[in-house]
Amino acid sequence: MRGRHPQVTRAARRRGRPLAAQADRYALYQKSVQSPDFDIALMNRIYRAHNGRPPLLLREDFCGAAALACAWAGSRRDRRAYGIDLDPEPLAWGALHNWQGLPEEARRRVQLVQGDVRTVRTPRADLIAAHNFSFFIFRERDQLRDYFRSARRQLAEGGLLVLDVLGGSDTQTEDREEVRRIGGGVRYVWEQKRYDPINNRALFAIHFAFKDGSLMKDAFTYDWRMWTVPELRELLAEAGFAFSEVYWEDAEAGTGEGSGVFRRRERAGAEACWMAVIAAGTRPPAR
């Protein structure tokens, strides 16, 4: 599928500034990738199963534009959130577009912090979320273990660290693209640029293709180590977590696509592409 979407067609040039040059990459990312309400519902279900009460304080690590942190504060009047990210650009965008969009009372319950998630200290949280495979940026075991240890210290008693994980044979290929429409004449393009099986390291990119033929190329790029579920659970145990459990996404019958339904599982079948959520807790589960 390479070369299918030219960056700017002649027709787009004739009409003036191409749509790709006018678009906001963060707005497109949130529209195509993030589902804060879904994430909140899933984390709430998992936390309540372990603690018998709703979680109130969320820390969103690697928060980017803090869509989850802001949605969290907006979901209940007694909820607070911290969003932590090293990059000032998405934080500034999130402050303008997500934080400012909250009612004044809710804005007081959200704090956005620029800093390294391994060193920023916040009040102990009921939940720490590291979503969108953000912790895959740590490519060495010691680095990732250090992050898990710091997260463990930032959790309240009974707190949970919630991670999402991506894998399967389809993620271990090169020159592969997935295209889907996200509305407004825009197509989301996920490209797998490179995969190194010796280091289990992969390079991905998100592009956005527009109806005028223009392309926002490399809107976001990711250089990740593709951590496996057993590796992550071992590192969580080494970091001091009392337990971890896996919530596996069911596949749709017939298509094999993700259904959005996550169930706690001990085993799973070989799927070409899968997503899962790992929840790690500070104390052994009651069940």
Question: For each predicted feature, which ranges?
Answer:
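Conserved class I S-adenosyl-L-methionine
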Residues: 54-64
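Conserved SAM-binding loop of SAM-dependent methyltransferases across substrates and taxa
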Residues: 65-78
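Conserved SAM-binding loop
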Residues: 94-95
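Conserved SAM-binding strand-loop segment of SAM-dependent methyltransferases
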Residues: 102-117
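A short acidic, Gly/Pro-enriched loop at the edge of an enzyme's catalytic core
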Residues: 118-128
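A short glycine-rich, Lys/Arg-flanked "PGG" loop and its adjoining helix->strand segment in the class I
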Residues: 143-157
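SAM-dependent methyltransferase
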Residues: 162-235
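C-terminal lobe and adjacent flexible extensions of AdoMet/dcAdoMet transferase-like proteins
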Residues: 223-287
